[in-house]
């Protein structure tokens, strides 16, 4: 029999389940409203979707890397207790592995259903908040890092070298791992100053100028101070200009140049990502 949109909407309003799930449930039971509600409960969908309005401010970051790709996944939940739950952790590790191996940065219907079933089992609002997948070329080296027992911070960084034979070099691998730790510690927003939106730079400059208006200093002095403040601020939010985590006398850019000279090949950061809970 044909299921009308009005019937689907009625079931959706009653259960909070998604339009597609309601249509499937009604089709499965020949359009019987009560049986369709029961079907959704059996699937764990209705109860999970009713919880979807609750705040999910906790969670966990998952990561996986193979020879072809690296990925990060942030799954949100309501409590840190659930973020430590064995079923939750096992599911997250399995899901990020599936995503990396497939190269997909979005969930398919089966994966969406598995999340709803997990939410129904654990009885919390659980959802995927972020996914990021990045390919790895033969001359690129990746390190990922999850911080702490609860993995509330997860990062990866990807470096490229001109000489592919240097990929296994110990100094390069140590640098890459140190840079992953650096990203976790300092959470840069951009790779370089050139990546920062010009409008943001202009707005920030105006903020600093406003702050100096009441100083009474000459205009040329104010401009110099503002220029210094802006340079310092951009250095704090861009990875290459930040002080290196293991030696803040060097910027990250200078540390990369140092290692590059020592192993006789050009090194550059081409991608990084920082995920955090909350």
UniProtKB/Swiss-Prot annotation:
The keyword Repeat does not apply. Pfam families: EF_TS. The keyword Protein biosynthesis applies. PROSITE patterns: EF_TS_1. One of its GO terms (cellular component) is cytoplasm. GO terms for molecular function: translation elongation factor activity. Its main location: cytoplasm. Residues 79-82 are annotated as: Involved in Mg(2+) ion dislocation from EF-Tu. InterPro entries: EF-Ts_dimer_sf, Transl_elong_EFTs/EF1B, Transl_elong_EFTs/EF1B_dimer, Transl_elong_Ts_CS, UBA-like_sf. It is found in: Cytoplasm. Keywords: Cytoplasm, Elongation factor, Protein biosynthesis. Belongs to the EF-Ts family. Associates with the EF-Tu.GDP complex and induces the exchange of GDP to GTP. It remains bound to the aminoacyl-tRNA.EF-Tu.GTP complex up to the GTP hydrolysis stage on the ribosome. This is Elongation factor Ts. It comes from Borrelia hermsii (strain HS1 / DAH). The lineage of its organism: Bacteria, Pseudomonadati, Spirochaetota, Spirochaetia, Spirochaetales.
